[in-house]
Amino acid sequence: MEDMNEYSNIEEFAEGSKINASKNQQDDGKMFIGGLSWDTSKKDLTEYLSRFGEVVDCTIKTDPVTGRSRGFGFVLFKDAASVDKVLELKEHKLDGKLIDPKRAKALKGKEPPKKVFVGGLSPDTSEEQIKEYFGAFGEIENIELPMDTKTNERRGFCFITYTDEEPVKKLLESRYHQIGSGKCEIKVAQPKEVYRQQQQQQKGGRGAAAGGRGGARGRGRGQGQNWNQGFNNYYDQGYGNYNSAYGGDQNYSGYGGYDYTGYNYGNYGYGQGYADYSGQQSTYGKASRGGGNHQNNYQPY
């Protein structure tokens, strides 16, 4: 009964919200769980780990197209001592498979995120509306509104930079936000040097990330697959090529701000960007003149 109560408590929050809210920071209560059966559900994992302590958040990563488990996830315990209890047990078996729990290590050298990418933004949303919505989370340092060079109209995304990281944590507690007339997705803008580091770490995997389903110029849904072409301040892998994030390199290096170089679970890559966008892809236009040279330093998760 106690385990079920603990599970019901975490249902009050969006799955993974507490884990994602501090993804780039060390938290002694967080664990990475690899080697999961594709049949293992969030409930199964939570109930199993609850015997070691109260679980306050749990998420299993899935392929955005098929919905199939990628074979790994993250869990957050209320008490860091629970992590030690898990690690004291040398062997863990769930749904007929040996699973691989490890401490979640924040990537070294990463600054707390202060900049977010907002995807799915209606070009009709005024700058004042954007300021009003995002300003409610904290003090804004800068807003970047990229333009389409051909139409001279706003593109369907923007970047928000805050003066500190706390507003970003609050924003990430919910993946989707209703802004103006559209439902938008929020992602952290990742420094380019960290992205490069992750790519170097992943070279030993089963092919490059762009060699996934369809590759960088592979199967797309309309123009959405290439909406970053010409927006050269950002990596194509993160914005334009939704299919490039599937398959290919299976290392866990850098997933969600954690370093798991060399762990090759599952048959799906976890991607570098917006692999999970669907119907809104064609909204984002074609080319852009960007929004300032400081954009050169970022790449979203």
Curated annotation (Swiss-Prot):
GO biological process annotation, one example: mRNA metabolic process
Record PTM N6-methyllysine, positions in chain: 42
InterPro entries in UniProt: hnRPDL_RRM1 (IPR034847), Nucleotide-bd_a/b_plait_sf (IPR012677), RBD_domain_sf (IPR035979), RRM_dom (IPR000504)
Covalent link Glycyl lysine isopeptide (Lys-Gly) (interchain with G-Cter in SUMO2), residues: 90
Modified residues (Dimethylated arginine): 289
Record-listed Omega-N-methylarginine modification sites: 289
Modifications made to the protein after synthesis: Dimethylation of Arg-289 is probably of the asymmetric type.
Subcellular location: Nucleus; Cytoplasm
Keyword Glycosyltransferase: no
Residues with PTM N6-acetyllysine: 97
Subunit architecture: Interacts with TNPO1. Interacts with ZNF148.
Protein name per its UniProtKB record: Heterogeneous nuclear ribonucleoprotein D-like
Protein source organism: Mus musculus (Mouse)
Gene that specifies this protein: Hnrnpdl
